Structures are given as C-alpha cells and as structure tokens.
Amino acid sequence: MTKAKSFLKEIDYSKKEIEDFIDLAMQFKKLKKERIPHRYFDGLNIALIFEKTSTRTRSAFTVAGQDLGMNVSYLGKDDIQLGKKESLVDTAKVLGTMFDGIEYRGFKQESVELLAEFSGVPVWNGLTDTWHPTQMIADFMTVKEHFGKFEDLTLAYLGDGRNNVANSLLVTSAILGINVKIIAPKELQPESEIVALAKKHQTKGLITITDDTAAVADTDILYTDIWVSMGEKVDFKERIDLLLPYQINQALLNRVRKPNALVLHCLPAFHDLNTEIGREIYERYGYKELEMTDAVFQKHSQTIFQEAENRLHSIKAIMYHSLKNI
C-alpha cells in the first residue's frame, strides 16, 4: 500500500474521482439509513492521530471505522511522542507496522505528507492548516443532495479567505467546474499560490477573488467558517472589525437573487452565547454573533447539520477507496 492510496489534498484527484467519492458516500448513507451492515474490513485496525481538538472529524472517523468493521484507536497529542521524543518519520514507520490506516489532524501539511510517505499504509488528512479535504467531500455531497448537480452552480465563501476551508473550497470548486467566489477583505484573501493551484486544476467555471459583498447576488451556495482558526494568534478585536461586513445575516441574504440558495457552515459556529468562547467574546467586545447570525443559522440549520452528518458517510467512502484492495 503506497502514498497513492492516501487522501491528502483535493488537487491529487480529478473531477471524476471526486464525484466518485461523493457518489460512494451517498451509497454508504443509504446503507446506514436502511440499517444494512457494511463491515467490509473486519479485523483491520486504524489509528486516529489528533494534534488539534475535534468533534465532527473524530466522531465521523470513529463511527465510520466501526461501521466498516475496523478497530479504531485514538492517539491524542499527549498520548504519543509525535515530533517530541520521536521523529515523525520514525513514528510513521512504527505505526505502519501495527495499523492498516492512519488519520491525521494537525497543523503542518508536511506532517501528513510524511506520514503517508513513510508509514507504508493509507493516511487520511483530517485537517491541516492548509487543507481540509474530508470536509470537501461532505460539503459537495450536501450540494449534490440539494441541487442534484454541480453544473452552472455558483458558490460564495465569505470570511477569512486564507484559511484551510477557504483553500479547499476554492480548489475543489475549480476541479468540479463550479463558479467560486472568495469574498473577503484584501488582507484576508487567498495566497497567490492557492489561487494558482485552483486555476491549474480548473475544469470549468469562473474564479473570483473580491472584497465586494455585492458579489453574492447570483450565488447558489453561501459558505462561511469561524473567523479565527485553531492555533492562530491574532488581535481578535481587529479580526472582528475586519470581518463583520462579511457576516452572513438576513440583510446579506436579501441581496441574493436565488430564492433557494443553500447556506453552509463546517462548524463549530459562533452564532449565539451558548459557548464559553461566545460568552467571552460578548463580554470583551459586545458581539453576540460573529460569522453568521443566529436567525440565519436556525433557518438553515437542517442543511448545516445535514452537512455535518455527511462527514460520516464521506469518510467511509474515502477509507473504503483506500482499503478495498488491501
């Protein structure tokens, strides 16, 4: 089993291959809903390495692995010597002798690439600072469930255009031929290297990078994410002031001409005061809602949580693709 069976970033795949992942995920969702067992990998063992905290990714990989019949071991940042007392390369070689697959969620893209290179087993990128590829299969699965197609659709991402989700949305939309708009202040627009990758792998559609929120007018899908990424050290007040004009609220939705526009969020979302961080932000800065208002979140919660559920089915598809010939 080689690095080729790993799932590291979206640009490693063609339009057809990404569509195949999505179609397979939809089949797994049907099996789950109908309670049809699909323990295709009984007796295999996978490791889940988490340097960053997680709700959806950890839960999805755990349940997906168990549904597929595998034994799942969680390895948190305080559980193993990853890069501390043992090099990442040595860790990869050790884990590769014991596990049939490895999920990694952490900071550097280089880390997940090294795991894939030296472990000798499939490695799945659960999130790095650069890419979030498993999220994309779930996101565009949700888009296909809603619209039944990708052709002639336009997706607009509003917020921090330099984060991993924005990067992944930009390149995946380009690969699938979806018109994609990254709407963000100039200070937070995608790196030129990421835009170049999107253009290199573009199959159809248009790529737009702008700071003008009027660009939402002809969109079919609006997407946002938290304004400060995990581990990022920034002036929070400065970031809020910069991104508040890009909040998805009813006033912004009123500017969208498509009546059935889809609103997505990869979660977690700061839309109310029901979190410790949300209350802290309110006490310090006076804002009850950040990237999306609570009214919009509640109105579109069904599809947002559908998107979250689809992490499970899409991760099954990704792991099945890697392990089916083991």
Curated annotation (Swiss-Prot):
The keyword Cytoplasm applies. Its EC number is 2.1.3.3. SUPFAM superfamilies: Aspartate/ornithine carbamoyltransferase. It comes from the Bacteria. L-ornithine binds at residues 164, 225, 229-230. Disulfide bonds: none annotated. Keywords: Amino-acid biosynthesis, Arginine biosynthesis, Cytoplasm, Transferase. InterPro entries: Asp/Orn_carbamoyltranf_P-bd, Asp/Orn_carbamoylTrfase, Asp/Orn_carbamoylTrfase_sf, Asp_carbamoyltransf_Asp/Orn-bd, Orn/put_carbamltrans, OTCase_ArgI. Signal peptide: none annotated. Carbamoyl phosphate binds at residues 54-57, 81, 105, 132-135, 266-267, 311. GO terms for biological process: arginine biosynthetic process via ornithine; citrulline biosynthetic process; L-arginine biosynthetic process. GO terms for molecular function: amino acid binding; ornithine carbamoyltransferase activity. Pathway: Amino-acid biosynthesis; L-arginine biosynthesis; L-arginine from L-ornithine and carbamoyl phosphate: step 1/3. It is found in: Cytoplasm. GO terms for cellular component: cytoplasm. PANTHER family: ORNITHINE CARBAMOYLTRANSFERASE, CATABOLIC, ORNITHINE CARBAMOYLTRANSFERASE, MITOCHONDRIAL. This is Ornithine carbamoyltransferase. It comes from Streptococcus mutans serotype c (strain ATCC 700610 / UA159).
